[in-house]
Design a protein with these regions (language model features):
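Short, charged juxtamembrane terminal tails flanking transmembrane helices
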Residues: 2-8, 224-232
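Hydrophobic, aromatic-enriched alpha-helical segments typical of multi-pass transmembrane helices
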Residues: 17-53, 59-63, 67-225
Length: 232
């Protein structure tokens, strides 16, 4: 009787620990969806609060640039986005334990993107248009290029996490990001030369929002996968 009671108590404790671990994992994965929504909302808020800002012709980075009237408002929100992305990356790493190596690599890359973001905007913001170029602008461009590369790699590795449908969607996302990124890069050179960039805001947002959508879709699929496993 006593032994049976001990085993029952241990079983309950193990069940509670497993339940807490599952809840924590779901929260981490939910951070992926929340991070994408927060970034889009922060971008929209900044564009609304920035007098004279053009959503079609100005870059997202200009919202947090040195001299931007909304930089102080947006900084905590962008940093929160990075923290959420890091949490999601950890969640992907944990979810990949019973999946495949490619998903583990994707989780590590997403975590790295979030870590870079924590240093990118606070320490290496660009200057507002017409203010000239300094070391921070150069580092901003370098970190931007590194982040884009990590994003493409994360999507490429993450494409193998689910079936053919998600793989095709991921490949299409990469193609769109490369095309939009090339156009944004061309306008970036014009921005550095103090020339007009009538479509920079559009092409850059296609690039960024395409990636954010992919992160959100991955988060939803991973959450659904866990729900189906729990119901089985």
């Amino acid at each position: 009787m006593a032994a049976t009671g001990v085993h029952t108590s241990e079983g309950r404790q193990t069940g509670r620990l497993a339940s807490r671990a599952e809840t924590a994992q779901r929260v981490l994965l939910l951070c992926g969806l929340m991070s994408s929504l927060l970034y889009v909302g922060t971008d929209a808020l900044g564009a609304i609060r920035y007098p004279g800002y053009s959503y079609t012709s100005q870059a997202i980075s200009e919202l947090g640039a040195i001299g931007s009237p909304v930089a102080a408002l947006l900084m905590p929100l962008f940093l929160t986005y990075d923290v959420l992305l890091i949490a999601f990356g950890v969640g992907v790493l944990r979810a990949a334990v019973d999946r495949n190596r490619a998903l583990r690599v994707a989780g590590a890359l997403l975590t790295a993107i979030g870590v870079i973001g924590l240093f990118w905007l606070p320490f290496f913001p660009m200057h507002a248009r017409g203010a000239g170029t300094t070391l921070t602008d150069t580092m901003h461009i370098v970190l931007s290029a590194v982040t884009v590369l990590l994003i493409l790699l994360a999507i490429g590795f993450g494409a193998r996490a689910f079936g053919k449908g998600f793989r095709r969607y991921s490949i299409a996302t990469i193609l769109i990001l490369v095309a939009a990124g090339a156009l944004a890069g061309r306008d970036g050179a014009r921005l550095a030369a103090q020339l007009p960039t009538p479509w920079l805001g559009v092409t850059e947002r296609i690039n960024v929002f395409g990636y954010l959508l992919w992160v959100a879709v991955l988060a939803v699929l991973l959450l659904r996968s866990r729900s189906h496993r729990a119901d089985a």
